[in-house]
Design a protein with these regions (language model features):
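Flanking helices and flexible, charged tails adjoining ferredoxin-like Fe-S electron-transfer domains
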Residues: 1-5, 167-239
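Iron-sulfur-associated redox domains of electron-transfer enzymes in respiratory
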Residues: 1-123, 128
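Short gly/pro-enriched beta-turn/loop segments at secondary-structure junctions
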Residues: 2-5, 128-130, 143-144, 149-150
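Local cysteine-cluster metal-coordination motifs and their immediate loop/turn environment
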Residues: 12-17, 47, 60, 65-69, ...
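Surface-exposed beta-strand edges and their flanking turn/coil or helix-capping segments
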Residues: 22, 52-53, 97, 155, ...
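Small-side-chain structural scaffolding
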Residues: 23, 29, 43-46, 133, ...
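Helix N-cap / beta->alpha transition motif
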Residues: 39-42, 136, 210
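Ferredoxin-like iron-sulfur electron-transfer modules
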Residues: 121-142, 153-179, 188-197
Length: 239
């Protein structure tokens, strides 16, 4: 059941997991029904940057990706968990029913066109958007395997708790730490398949990732970056 009149939709602008036409149609129908609607380009980015809008958004209904992912993201940002509907997995009639609207609601064509234009205007940053892990603490056993595996300083240990400390350090499109998690507690909301993306399927039927190769590749990249920084320092002219 919908908790409030204000509804926030996430467009996931730099990825294609959420159909933009569905976003435009849903926004138009909600607006026609008298709801206050806001489309956010990338909720993950707002959360990574800990936007001061998060508390406001959390007080209302959020229509975005998988609820388990949204819950973990808002908990990481130390914000209340909003009522969430899954736009990534559900079709338009299912979402409308969950929002207490007729499943066959008329779609206002002019407003759909306006929202479509808004969506097309969002900045797209393929390869540079907010890719980072979040942790489902209801599953995490604080074993620290993710911390030990990651070469980029994404995780830290605070007491006996694993914390995502530097999300911006994460290597784009690398979910290797999630593959190594014994309880499937690590979520990458922008990953393609469940359970790594927070979807509820029991087992993932994806092409397996060779974590040893990923680790070695990441290590080489890190060593190369370190050598480059040392070279720059050596060649810097003296004052």
């Amino acid at each position: 059941m919908m908790q409030s009149q204000k509804i926030t939709l996430c467009a996931c602008a730099s990825r294609t997991f959420i159909n933009s036409e569905k976003v435009a149609q849903l926004a138009a129908i909600l607006e026609a029904a008298g709801k206050a609607v806001e489309i956010v380009p990338d909720l993950c980015e707002w959360i990574e940057n800990k936007s001061d809008r998060l508390k406001e958004i959390a007080a209302h209904t959020v229509v975005a990706c998988h609820p388990r992912a949204i819950k973990a993201l808002f908990e990481w940002a130390e914000q209340p968990v909003p009522h969430t509907l899954d736009m990534r997995a559900n079709d338009l009639p299912t979402l409308l029913t969950a929002l207490d609207l007729p499943a066959d609601s008329a779609i206002p064509a002019e407003r759909v066109a306006a929202f479509r234009t808004q969506l097309e205007g969002f900045s797209k940053q393929p390869g540079q958007d907010a890719w980072f892990p979040t942790i489902d603490k209801s599953r995490c056993i604080e074993c620290g395997k993710c911390h030990d595996f990651c070469l980029f300083g994404v995780y830290t240990l605070e007491g006996k708790k694993v914390v995502v400390k530097a999300p911006q350090n994460c290597k784009n499109n690398c979910p290797a730490c999630a593959r190594n998690c014994p309880t499937q507690a690590i979520i990458f909301p922008k990953y393609a398949q469940a359970p790594i993306n927070g979807g509820e399927q029991a087992e993932e039927k994806a092409i397996s990732i060779d974590t040893a190769t990923l680790y070695n590749t990441a290590l080489r990249e890190r060593l190369a970056a370190r050598r480059a920084s040392v070279s720059i320092l050596k060649n810097r002219p003296k004052a």
